[in-house]
């Protein structure tokens, strides 16, 4: 009798432990990438070679507005566009392309983008080829606070 009581007690405790444990999975949603703001170039590569020291990009500024307009300041270096206009990203959470349409044109120019986090700050990486497909530029932008 004691043996049956002992086994039934162990079985009851085991069942209580089994049914009391619930596994829940936290769903982590990818945040929307905030591309709006004023950006400055911190690194330039051409065909995977760092040419930052040879490019005068100190005054270059790219401002992406909340209203999907962009402005360029001191644009004296190769870039996708040469004048102000409107911009769009292909996906707010997982953007892979950034498109620019100058005000004085109906043509849209698109560059591939990445949004790496460096030192806890989201950066903007734009890859494009201005005219010559043999040359590929990568501009790493840092948001100006």
Roles of regions detected by a PLM:
Residues 22-82, 92-145:
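Lipid interaction determinants
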